[in-house]
Each structure stands twice: as C-alpha cells, then as structure tokens.
Amino acid sequence: MRHRVAGRHLNRTSSHRLAMRRNIVSSLFEHETISTTMPKAKEVRGFAEKLITLAKKGDLASRRRAIALLNNRAIYKEENGSNVQVGTVIGKLFSEIGPRYLDRPGGYTRIIRLPKRRLGDNGQLVLLQLVGQDDKKLSNK
C-alpha cells in the first residue's frame, strides 16, 4: 500500500530525479518560463519556491545552501556568433529573482496548461513560469 509516500517517482532512479529537478529549476531561473509536463512541473514547483525563499534572505548561509541544492551553472548569451558567459544561475537568483519577490509571501511560480499534448506519449504540456515576469504581456492579450 502507498500510504504517506510523498513525491513522485516519475519512473526514474533517485539520482536521475535529483538531476532532473536541478536541471529544470536551473532552466526556470535562467529563462523564467519553461515548457514541461504536468507531473514534472508539480514536482519541481516546491523546490523552486524554496530556493526563491532562500534568495529573499540573501545572506551568505542562504547562498551556500542554494549552491548546495542547485547546480551553479553558467548562463550564456550569443554575441557575434559565439557564446559569452553573462553570469550564473545562483547569481541571477540572488541578484534579480530574490529581490523581485521581497514583498510577496509565497506563490512565486504559476502553472499554465497548454492546449497541445506531447507527441509520443500524449502527456499534458504546461508552462511553468515565475509570477510577475509576464504579467504585462498577459494583460495586453
């Protein structure tokens, strides 16, 4: 029986789930909106919100804890046909994303269902995005 078992296995090993969670959240912080399946989005949502709460504190211990929980990968931007490093995921989290939500007590992400389904397994696709970054675009449409 499956009583009191938290989390989703997503048909992966524990190390694969951890790597997938880190990669999805890193991509979310880098691009601020990503397309994924509904179970993956629901699984990583709490992890992303926990990291944003750490970024709101902004102290050294919170930064070190966020680095331990998340891969501190570089963010690249294409300039003149070559990729140039413009920062890191943790740097963006603590300098841009954390201060953006200082007056918000929680609920930093939103899940929007997409009308199309994934080709192959017919999985429900969703947009996982940070709240506040596309509010102007949504209100204009």
Placement of each model-derived feature along the sequence:
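Structured, basic alpha/beta domains of bacterial-type, RNA-associated proteins
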Residues: R2-N11, A19, N23-K141
